[in-house]
Amino acid sequence: MTVSTKRLSDGPIIRANMDGRMGTNINGPSLIECPHWVPDPLGVYYLYFADHRGTYLRLAYAEDVKGPWHTYEPGVLDVAQSSFVTETQLDGEFDYPHVASPDVHVMSKTGEVRMYYHGLCENGDQMTAVA
């Protein structure tokens, strides 16, 4: 079996500072086709992503996978809504409050959209949670 990939456009689909809150670090994208049972969808495609030092998980949406993409400026999950710390006295290189690396799955049988993500625990470990 041969697997190949093809770039759909010449530039990035998500750019730094697409909205006033986003910042410049964009990583960990997870794309889904919005399920038909989601009420009032923003678009056909949802792209979840983060800033590894960010305090919220972001969402972009589009009618076509090629774009144009628009950001949902409030984001979808703030660190304060997660089970992770919002403040810390730790001083290690990676010991800052954050939520990042969204991995989103459509659970058609249960009518759920599950998002796995990670963040910082009180002891400095980084763990995965689900929303």
Predicted regions and their residues:
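Beta-rich carbohydrate-recognition and catalytic domains
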Residues: M1-V99, H105-A131
